[in-house]
């Protein structure tokens, strides 16, 4: 069975997020605190990466992540702490609602999914993303029909790379007797977690990043269409 991470593996989280953040910048008058939407985007993504790393380790809750990823950039921009906290609640709702309606996929994603489906491969999603937005992404971009099941950390009770997440995915799919293989862009959450769980793993590495020292037992592709030569 083939398991795909969703964000930045199949669904273009980076590109879609930039559009949503620009919409927030313009609709909420953020030029009062940031010189450009580029500055706002850079500050947000720096903070968001730090918080997602903490969330993946279980150091913070999803509720804290969702509020702090907007409150902290606003404070950095000069918004008072109280106002930043209030604005962050609204920003989170607006952002996730907009994000769930975006449709851009990673280059070659649909072509590759069509090919794998035509070859009879069963495919599922494994994601740390929030339930209320991940299903909207799948439906809006018309890729929900490729995947069964969709396994989210909200349902598993733990995040990738925890072993219990991967065991839960296998239980949901009933794929204990199958070879489970993950394709994902995150070396620690997707690849290291899968290898530890005894899965096969293919690192989607479009940027050509250097691998982590000491991590073995996985393959690498820089374009999703390479999967057509492997399956």
List the predicted regions and their residue ranges.
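N-terminal helical cap/lid subdomain that shapes the substrate entry/recognition surface
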Residues: 1-107
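Asp-based, Mg2+/Mn2+-dependent phosphohydrolase catalytic module
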Residues: 1-2, 15, 110, 114-117, ...
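Short alpha-helix boundary/capping motifs
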Residues: 38, 72, 98-102, 119, ...
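Residue-level marker of alpha-helix boundaries and capping positions
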Residues: 61, 103, 125, 181-182
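Short beta-strand/loop segments at the ligand-binding rim of alpha/beta enzyme cores
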Residues: 121-123
């Amino acid at each position: 069975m083939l398991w795909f991470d969703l964000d930045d593996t199949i669904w273009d989280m980076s590109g879609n997020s930039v559009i949503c953040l620009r919409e927030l910048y313009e609709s909420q008058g953020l030029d009062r605190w940031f010189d450009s939407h580029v500055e706002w985007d850079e500050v947000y993504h720096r903070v968001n990466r730090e918080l997602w790393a903490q969330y993946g380790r279980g150091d913070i809750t999803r509720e804290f992540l969702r509020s702090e990823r907007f409150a902290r950039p606003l404070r950095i921009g000069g918004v008072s702490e109280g106002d930043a906290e209030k604005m962050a609640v609204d920003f989170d709702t607006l952002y996730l609602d907009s994000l769930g309606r975006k449709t851009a996929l990673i280059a070659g994603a649909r072509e590759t999914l069509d090919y794998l489906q035509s070859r009879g491969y069963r495919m599922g999603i494994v994601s740390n993303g929030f339930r209320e937005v991940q299903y909207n992404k799948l439906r809006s971009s018309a890729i929900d029909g490729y995947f069964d099941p969709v396994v989210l950390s909200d349902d598993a009770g733990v995040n990738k790379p925890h072993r219990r997440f991967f065991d839960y995915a296998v239980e949901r799919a009933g794929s204990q007797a199958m070879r489970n293989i993950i394709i994902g862009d995150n070396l620690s959450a997707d690849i290291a977690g899968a290898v530890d769980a005894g899965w096969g793993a293919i690192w989607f590495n479009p940027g050509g990043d250097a691998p982590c020292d000491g991590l073995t037992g996985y393959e690498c592709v820089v374009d999703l269409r390479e999967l057509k030569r492997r399956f």
